[in-house]
Amino acid sequence: MSYRTLLVHLDDSPRCRVRTDLALDLALDLARRWDAHLIGLYVVCQDLLEPLRRPGEPLELGVHERLTEQRRKAAEQQFLKAAEAAGRAVEWQAPAGAPSHTVIRHARHADLLLLGQEDPDDRLSHVAAHFIEDVVMGAGRPAIVVPRAGRVSSCGENVLIGWDGSREAARALADALPLLAHAKLVDVVTVESLHSDPDRTPAGVDVAAYLERHQVRAAFSTVPRERAAGAGETLLDRATELHADLLVMGLYSHTRMHERMLGGVTRTVLGKMSIPVLLSH
């Protein structure tokens, strides 16, 4: 089992460089194992009103179009230059169309996606509302979300798996196997639920046994859920304690509307993450 096609979403935000660097690092690693193909997919916000609200920019549509083209060329040059320096042949695509639908369409023939965490303080990084969730759910492919702050020095060496027994968690576990096979440390963590049913939730020991049959050695534990913190914050705290460099979890155990209206583990993690997160649905 392997990742043979890696697709990274690129935009014109300042944090885009982090995704490019991480994508190439991962691509080189994957290439050594499976000769993975890397695609840079440049898709930006196409809502004309959103870019025109950006502070310090002229409001003339013609000027905006020229700036948009300049940013596209700059992103392409950055991506291709980094790939050349790394000695990798890559593919560049900049299709037109509605952002979410365009990325979903291209993502469906990739093995793994790389997306960037939304940054509420960076208007240039806005692509579409709930972009990450919609892409992962619509494409049916796993995605590694890169944090907007800090520096990613490693990804997949020390992995924490958030396990709640859901189909989404099971999907994420299976989708992460190519990475888990090369991890140095793997921890399966279950956050105690207020209404847990041990008869219906596979225990961490069973998940560890499943991974063992894939030649992945994993530890397992159950951590208490503090009253003041939800399951998402508890997982992130545990990841910090274990010095994890990748969190693997399912996207939306509740309905999408429930998560968007009331919040949930997914929204908490996507908002507060400081390490890469592999999401799958």
Predicted regions and their residues:
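Short, flexible loop segments at boundaries between secondary-structure elements
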Residues: 271-281
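Small/aliphatic-rich secondary-structure junction motif
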Residues: 1-59, 138, 155-223
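A structural preference for short, hydrophobic beta-strand core positions in alpha/beta folds
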Residues: 40, 91-94, 145, 188, ...
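A short acidic, glycine-rich active-site loop
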Residues: 60-74
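Structural beta-alpha unit
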Residues: 1-2, 45, 80-113, 213-247, ...
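P-loop/Walker A phosphate-binding loop and immediately adjacent motor/lid segment at beta-alpha junctions
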Residues: 73, 77-86, 123-147, 208, ...
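Glycine-rich, Arg-bearing micro-motifs that act as flexible, cationic patches
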Residues: 18, 115-134, 156, 249-271
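Hydrophobic alpha-helical segments and helix pairs
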Residues: 89-150
